[in-house]
Amino acid sequence: TADIDFTKEEPSAVLNYNVEIKGKDYNNITCKVELFDEEGTKLSETEGSEGTFEISNVRLWQPLNAYLYKIKVTAGQDVYTLPYGVRSVRVDGTKFLINEKPFYFKGYGKHEDTFPNGRGINLPMNTKDISIMKWQHANSFRTSHYPYSEEMMRLCDEEGIVVIDETTAVGVNLQFGGGANFGGERIGTFDKEHGVQTQEHHKDVIRDLISRDKNHACVVMWSIANEPDSAAEGAYDYFKPLYDLARELDPQKRPCTLVSVQGTTADTDCSSQLSDVICLNRYYGWYFGGPDL
């Protein structure tokens, strides 16, 4: 994580690191951590699995203007290098601030598929997608509706693309298709008897997502779910522990949201009480409304 001092004319930062080492005799493994700038010049070096780096006149990771330091970890014979962008994110009233400056999201609910490969990874198409986004003056996308490949996340770090990172929880909503029918019994989405296992699995998905993507500068917000039955009875009790878990796990304490299905309203949708940012799905020109966008 980075603690950035914006009070100076040239911001400075303190990077706090914690290296988790697993395996046989991990307690006896010596750990060395080095910090390099983007040109490869070593700025600092320290020993131990926990510590800090101080950077004066820090180069910030900015939307569409990325700067990535390199953190090199040597643990025994293993070496791992992490590109790391220094930036801050917070919500202040109606403003979404990146590096203490208001940010306006211009982009898409994207999908990670291509004509030649389907859901298979295609690195040139990833590069093409980002190039088209920049040509259209877009600056961001949501990973609708699943975590994207690590290669795409690294590319967004490098290109300064802002990402709303979403779990695989799409359509936690038994009202789709006329409602669920279990042996002739209609039940609600968050029926306490049937929904416990779903919530526990949902927690696992959040843990996996944040564990993998927590160090990506491009990720500025976590999306807990897409199009859930968030206005239904029991929705608040289902989602509040999930928001609490995400906020607990994320060392950067990024904002959290869920993206509501069209038709829900702020007075009934539980996300209006839980989310740092209200996100709404609107399908004009996609499912209905003709070609005018």
Predicted features and spans:
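Secreted/periplasmic carbohydrate-active enzymes, especially glycoside hydrolases
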Residues: 1-163, 205, 218-221, 237-248, ...
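Substrate-binding/catalytic cleft of secreted carbohydrate-active enzymes
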Residues: 130-132, 140-293
